Amino acid sequence: MELTSKEFKSELILEVQACLQLAVPLVITQILEAGIPLLDGVMMGLLNSQALAAGALGAVTFSTLASVCRSILSAVGVNVANAFGAGKIDQVSRATGQGIWLAVTMCLPVMFIIWHFDYILLLTGQEESNVLLAQTYLRSIVWGFPAALGFCILKEVSSALNRPQFLTVITVAGLLLNAVANYVLMFGKFGLPALGLAGIGWASTLIFWLNFIAAASWICFDNYFKDYQLDCALHQFDKDMFIDIFQTGWFLGLQYGAEIGVFTATALMMGWFGTETLAAHEITVETESFVETVSIGISYAVTMRVGQLRGQNDLKSASRAGLVCIALVTPFVSIVALIFWLFPNYIVAMYLDTSNLDNIEIVKTATSFLAAGAIVQIFYSIQTIAAGALIGLKDTKVPVLITMFAYWVVGLGGGYLMAFTFGWGAIGLWLGLILGLVMGAMLLTGRFYLLTSEIESG
């Protein structure tokens, strides 16, 4: 039945309200979570430029591996959202349990890789002094990895159940404590040894565990969650559901691994241009990552919203939810892009003393990177939300192929050609990222449009 114009506007307003109700706390939480690595990057710069460069290697390594694992675990949220939408309360606890077992399965091998990642960094041609310093960071933050995955599962479940607000409170406290812990452990206050870059890693480990314990405690004592019997999750191993979550998560891990892996590979190639270029790249990436948390938060919301509506078999509304979220993020990222273009010096000044002549090359390079980063974050935001909507539909296989083609063939391949073959230098790598993200945004958004058009017509 066709909707009248008034009815359509009414449903559209209701969908915007529903998306915002879920998205706002998730965006705030995501911003606060991203505040930890951003704060770490700023405080690395307080040590010296080498600590900032080495910290970039360590941070991007940990972030890449952690993000892949979190992406795999996002399949838990999709399953919980489907069960919640369908009113299958018993399936909520069962899906949560399988997610916990999956996290346990991944934890030890990934921690082993992080511990020994210095060998891989050396093979990529990084300066040995930077690698040795990055190793101290990696071998301290690695102990927070299990807690980071645990918090991820609790975030997925609470978001799928429309109860993410308490996460904001926890992450506010975590960010404030992280600043204090960084300062104390970096510079050796209150009788503690000055650990330098390693101190930042230990501070992150502490915050990961405190956040996880706080979230688990909140869920245990919040009456809202009692009907879902999440405390029994570990006692309900379901082989079929475990395999289903793993299969869905595996493709999500590949998709996000391909995406984030491009940024990792780009950082490694930036290292070939020297410490100053790598430091400038770290400034741009950290700032970019912080801004993109808004898009990532909205993408979590659209995944849960589309997943819930899919569970209700209301696929027309699921289509509307995806398009509404894409429309919501576009004005924000456009404004931020203008800030990147107009005020790059103020952004760089958050990390380094721009009046220090020793930093002049870093400032100049970072300014050019930020101009390219402005374009990057517009298309990154669009493709991230489109990908989130497709996850809610449990469409994962084709998006993996799209992501690999867009990022690795178009993005990294094009960036390498421009940077090294054409001789454009480090900025060529950022131009390659722009090409890859434009391609990814177009293809993923187009696929969501095609799938939902088929749904509506069918």
Question: Residues of each region from the PLM?
Answer:
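Short alpha-helical transmembrane segments in multi-pass integral membrane proteins
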Residues: M1-A23, V80-P146, L192-W250, V306-I375, ...
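N-terminal transmembrane alpha-helices
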Residues: S10-V42, L46-L47, V60-A75, N79, ...
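Transmembrane helical elements of multi-pass membrane transporters/channels
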Residues: Q21-D40, S140, G174, I207-N211, ...
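Transmembrane alpha-helix boundary and packing residues in multipass membrane permease domains
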Residues: L26, Q30, G41-V42, A59, ...
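Helix-terminus/linker motif at the lipid-water interface of multi-pass membrane proteins
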Residues: I31, G35-A53, L121-E128, V184-L195, ...
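Small-residue hotspots at the loop-to-helix junctions and early N-terminal turns
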Residues: S49-V60, L138, G201, T275-F290, ...
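Small-residue-rich hydrophobic transmembrane alpha-helices
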Residues: L52-M111, W115, A148-L167, A280-P344, ...
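Short runs within selected transmembrane alpha-helices of multi-pass transporters and secretion channels
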Residues: L73, I141-A160, L167-L175, I200-A216, ...
